[in-house]
């Protein structure tokens, strides 16, 4: 006889994971790399963090691999629990709503664009003698750019007036640091958030609005436009 009560929670968890496969595969990889960093010696840990960074040095040597690999590591392994919660609250909901490929496209573009733009600002600051040349080797890894983009997209999932309260909170969270000595990471977060907000056309609601506009234009009194 199969247990009913014990299998129900497991089934719900499995269904939740399957409904957002990209989020949970990504989270699994981050969990593994966090364990590697936590178990490594200090020297090996520093080497791995710098080698997998998308800083100026690594972008010049390994542009494609550094952009990809940097999104699978976090600098502080104990923060994995916080990131896991954020992945479930933000990424999983957005992936389930958009579909895996549109979600992946959005966060991928945001991660790459924010990384390249922020590192370009670092390079300009180094050339202008506002930052030391050692910043070419700065540790630049993490998942926060993707989270910022997904957080922007999540706004369109909420109905008014909650959407506007959420937007004000998110914009304040990522925008306030820009007013008080912003770092290159703060600027990257703002860029990623902006790209997430700009991805409205990828949402199901945008497609529904376009279909509704097409239906209205085809009704009597609203002939379709000439081409």
Regions found by a protein language model. Give the residues of each.
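N-terminal signal-anchor transmembrane alpha helix
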Residues: 3-50
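Hydrophobic, membrane-inserted alpha-helices
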Residues: 66, 84-92, 147-153, 168-178
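Actinobacteria-biased recognition of intrinsically disordered, low-complexity terminal regions
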Residues: 1-23, 202-227
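Aromatic-anchored segments of alpha-helical transmembrane domains
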Residues: 31-36, 111-120, 169-184
């Amino acid at each position: 006889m199969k247990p009913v009560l014990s299998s129900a929670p497991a089934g719900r968890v499995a269904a939740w994971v399957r409904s957002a496969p990209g989020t949970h595969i990504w989270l699994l990889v981050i969990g593994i790399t966090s364990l590697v960093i936590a178990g490594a010696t200090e020297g090996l840990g520093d080497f791995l963090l710098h080698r997998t960074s998308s800083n100026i040095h690594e972008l010049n040597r390994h542009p494609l691999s550094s952009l990809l690999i940097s999104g699978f590591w976090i600098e502080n392994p104990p923060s994995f629990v916080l990131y896991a919660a954020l992945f479930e609250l933000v990424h999983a909901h957005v992936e389930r709503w958009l579909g895996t490929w549109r979600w992946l496209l959005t966060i991928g573009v945001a991660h790459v664009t924010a990384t390249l733009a922020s590192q370009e600002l670092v390079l300009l600051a180094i050339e202008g003698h506002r930052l030391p040349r050692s910043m070419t080797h700065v540790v630049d890894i993490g998942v926060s750019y993707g989270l910022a983009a997904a957080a922007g997209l999540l706004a369109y999932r909420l109905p008014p007036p909650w959407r506007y309260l959420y937007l004000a909170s998110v914009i304040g969270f990522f925008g306030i640091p820009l007013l008080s000595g912003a770092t290159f990471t703060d600027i990257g977060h703002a860029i990623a958030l902006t790209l997430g907000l700009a991805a409205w056309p990828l949402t199901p609601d945008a497609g529904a609005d376009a279909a509704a506009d097409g239906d209205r234009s085809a009704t009597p009194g609203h002939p379709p436009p000439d081409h």
